[in-house]
């Protein structure tokens, strides 16, 4: 129902408009309070890059964070990542990730980023605390914050917005009548707009998600997707239909598609009941897999995806980030 409302296919959004006006007014006041100096932002001693979005729901933000980390690492830079840690609850914050930290503590996306990149990752409700914790333990050249475009308490040097190229901004209304956290006009003040799927517009950076081979959660074995048949596909992400579409485009034979809520926590018996028997493959997202590895079965697989940003804008973006890092380094010396 909410997808129909947000996409503009249902006129029920009229009932939610008063709440949306209130949401928009509050967010406007918050942003203005920082712009006018009524509230103070904290400046980190290293450059901060925010990767965020204007809408609720999955847009492909985490793959972009991973892409940035990996490409900056290849250029020789020491990169850290901070996050709010949605879906996790730690005994104390800030929480620095290591191999013993679980998704129940840190959330699924920070654990995924940590496992994929090996970069230092910290989570905290206040991103300032997470950045400070990282810098107390690691010498870093740049910090990337996963989400946090609207977290104005942390000053940023670069703002990147990721958009779902198929859904874009839905009906254009603020939450809850629509998907918007901020109005589309906010894009005029960011450094780059990355469009996941669809057709990018002028000055937008096109992006696609490229699927790898299926990986077995238990053994780590990799197989081409074409070798998995009669698959039960499951996804607990912001926009599950994107995952299912990726599988269909790859020619996967899907018996069932099961969508869970974003940041869903799973129980072993819950997932074991999804397949007919122990031979039918259960194929999930990598974000789901980080929550299921401790109780995985032999027939459970996940599909890693990588963000691919279109050239030449991808290289231009990295060059811009590098110039910011170098400028900060020269100012410190």
UniProtKB/Swiss-Prot annotation:
This protein's record includes keyword Nucleotide-binding: yes
Superkingdom as given in the UniProt entry: Bacteria
Binding sites annotated in the UniProt record for ATP: 55-62
Keyword Lipid biosynthesis: yes
General function of this protein: Transfers the gamma-phosphate of ATP to the 4'-position of a tetraacyldisaccharide 1-phosphate intermediate (termed DS-1-P) to form tetraacyldisaccharide 1,4'-bis-phosphate (lipid IVA).
NCBIfam families assigned to the protein according to its UniProt record, in alphabetical order: lpxK
Family to which the UniProt record says this protein belongs: Belongs to the LpxK family.
Protein name in UniProt: Tetraacyldisaccharide 4'-kinase
Annotated gene: lpxK
